């Protein structure tokens, strides 16, 4: 049964995050998805970020709405960019253009340790109405909503 890893901050849980999470469950099939959620301690963003507790709660609520049984996934706290993917046996890692370099680093470290590399599943950014990627930063700045719709100027 496939073990699939995906990680992130999942601030505002926007459509880009949804695509990553949905792809993880698609690839896992009858296997299990391990979602690494960035800890508060690890974050160093230019904008305020909701607490781990709030982000975890929203993530779990979203997965529940997807109808995924609890035994098909696990949410863990990420205290470093690689999380458990270095030591544990995963088959796939789901990445965005932003996290792709981390997956390459993970595979380099795994290979040095004699472990098989993870199959990297690359998921493109989801674009907002203006053709620019949806991001938590843009949402935080009030440019777009979680679905990439442009906010009207006041």
Swiss-Prot record:
It is an enzyme of class 2 (transferase). SUPFAM superfamilies: Nucleotidylyl transferase. InterPro entries: Cyt_trans-like (IPR004821), PPAT_arch (IPR023540), Rossmann-like_a/b/a_fold (IPR014729). One of its GO terms (biological process) is coenzyme A biosynthetic process. It catalyses: (R)-4'-phosphopantetheine + ATP + H(+) = 3'-dephospho-CoA + diphosphate. Its main location: cytoplasm. Reversibly transfers an adenylyl group from ATP to 4'-phosphopantetheine, yielding dephospho-CoA (dPCoA) and pyrophosphate. This is Phosphopantetheine adenylyltransferase. The gene is coaD.
């Amino acid at each position: 049964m496939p073990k699939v890893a995906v990680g992130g901050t999942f601030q505002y849980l926007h459509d880009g995050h949804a695509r990553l999470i949905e792809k993880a469950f698609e690839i896992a099939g009858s296997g299990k998805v391990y979602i690494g959620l960035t800890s508060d301690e690890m974050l160093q963003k230019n904008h305020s970020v909701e607490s781990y507790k709030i982000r975890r709660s929203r993530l779990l609520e979203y997965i529940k709405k997807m109808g995924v049984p609890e035994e098909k996934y696990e949410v863990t706290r990420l205290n470093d960019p690689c999380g458990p993917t270095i030591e544990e046996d995963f088959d796939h890692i789901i990445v965005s253009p932003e996290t792709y370099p981390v997956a390459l680093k993970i595979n380099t470290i795994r290979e040095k340790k004699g472990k098989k590399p993870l199959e990297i599943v690359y998921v493109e950014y989801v674009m907002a109405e203006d053709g620019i990627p949806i991001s938590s930063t843009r949402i935080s700045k009030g440019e777009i909503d979680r679905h990439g719709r442009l906010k009207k100027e006041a």
